[in-house]
Amino acid sequence: MTSETDINKSASPTAAAKEQPEEPDGPLPGSASEQEKKVRFSPAIMSTKNSTDLVEYVDKGHSFLPAIPNTQRSQLEDRLNNQDRTIAFLLEQAFRIKEDISACLQGTHGFRKEESLARKLLENHIQTITSIVKKLSQNIEMIEEQIKARDLVATGTNFAVQDLSNKHLQGVGDLRGRVARCDSSIMKLSGDIHFIRNEHQQLEKTIQEMISSLQTVSKNLDTKVMQLLEKIEASSSEQISNLKMVQGDYRHEMNLLEFKFNSLSLNLYEEMENHQKRTENQLIKYEQEQLSRANQCLALLQEKLDMSEKNMEEKLLKLSSKLENFINTEKYEADLNKIKHTENKLSKKMSQLEKQIWDELEKMQDEYQSGFKSIHDSLNSLQRIQKTKMDLENYKVQKDLKKLQRKIAELQES
């Protein structure tokens, strides 16, 4: 709980230093457990701060109850529950303080200074409890005033309900008058409906007369349509004969176009195959050249490594011979340092050579990849050119087909 943390904070070191009594000259009487209790529950460590400051209360100007009447009762109950909790917490705190003081009095029996401090602490805590009770009574009075205000709000709502009932009665009277007006308008509409029915019967008679006249006209039209159908059949037979002639010409032209298209596709296929063979030959040559270069570089690197190993062996032999000649320990240590230095230099040189080798290999890989990219780009460009050629030829063939279709349509119309 927050109040317990505030109580722990209130026990400042300055207050403890002021209230700490002077130590006696000799050791305290009693067993070791009693002395530990004295150290635990000594009144010098306990706080003399007023504990009423630990509980926060709302100002009198601030209202506990909200403006909405539905939630007033629940908030008042919450407020009263909070007050009960604070009272219970304060009582528990007072009992704890009593127990601490009784333990201190039992541990410090026979020392007047500690007894006086314990009495002072009791007085301070009694004062704090009385002040807290006063504040709680003030808060209860405030809550009672707010309950009265809530009752006044309830009376206001009752008056508002009465006004609404009066307005409702007035609205019901207006609705009754409107219903009477609606009945009169319904009677007028029924008279209008009878008049419309009479007019509808007259219109039906005129429609039947019109139907009889239309039947005679339709018979005349049927005879004329039969004559036109006979003429259309004769003209259609003539057009069918003309279409057969045109279809024969169209098939002959289509065969010629197919022959041209097949010849062009064969030529393009042959060109594609030749180009692929050339590119494959170029790739094989380029790979062989790159492999020969890589083999040469590796041979040179191996020769260099062999030479460096031989030089290292010769130097190590010379150094070993020199070390055998030396007898003094100081010279031996100096030679060892030189050997280590030379070994470090050689390792650095070896690492540099390895880096150079890897750099050359990476360059060769980059060149190899760039060659492949250029060949791939050239192949893509050739494929695009061939696609454009095929599209142009298809466009020409479609144009020729459209022309033939137009000719056929003209012949059919003629």
Swiss-Prot record:
Segments forming a coiled coil: 70-94, 121-149, 188-223, 266-414
Entry keyword set: Coiled coil
Protein name: Protein FAM81B
Annotated family: Belongs to the FAM81 family.
Renumbered residue ranges of the record's region Disordered: 1-43
Top-level taxon of the source organism: Eukaryota
Cystine crosslinks: none
Family annotation (InterPro entries): FAM81
Composition bias type Polar residues, residue spans: 1-13
